[in-house]
């Protein structure tokens, strides 16, 4: 039997994003996309909100936006429980990260015919990085 802190309801899920002070939209498109993905994987979360964690209803996912300083882009997906925290954090230092990604996709698509999705690109280029390596 797991302690109550191990039950799914005891884990709080949230998204925190931080961008430079000049960024106008809040939350960013990336934060909205992350919220959509989290809600798909956690059906009891049916909407995201900018309300703080203290004001959340059970069906809401907290999204926090910070616009300050010179941080180009930072997104944290957090899962928090009374005795532990898990965070997945992505930060980009400049727009070069996105330019590099666009160039990689361009090289991948060069010479192909048809319409492609980022899922197809990821399946061919990123998924192999996570395959089990046998000793």
Language-model features, listed with the residues they occupy:
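C-terminal substrate-binding/catalytic lobe of Rossmann-fold NAD(P)-dependent oxidoreductases
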Residues: 9-135
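Rossmann-fold NAD(P)-binding glycine/threonine-rich loop
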Residues: 1-7
């Amino acid at each position: 039997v797991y302690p109550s802190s191990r039950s799914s309801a005891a884990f709080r899920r949230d998204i925190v994003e931080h961008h430079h002070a000049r960024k106008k939209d809040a939350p960013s498109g990336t934060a909205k996309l992350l919220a959509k993905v989290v809600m798909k994987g956690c059906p009891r979360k049916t909407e995201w909100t900018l309300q703080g964690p203290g004001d959340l209803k059970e069906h809401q996912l907290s999204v926090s936006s910070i616009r300050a300083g010179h941080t180009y882009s930072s997104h944290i997906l957090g899962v928090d429980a009374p005795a532990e925290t898990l965070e997945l954090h992505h930060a980009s230092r400049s727009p070069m990260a996105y330019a590099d990604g666009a160039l990689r996709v361009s090289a991948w698509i060069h010479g192909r015919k048809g319409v492609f999705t980022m899922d197809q690109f990821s399946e061919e280029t990123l998924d192999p990085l996570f395959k089990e390596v046998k000793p």
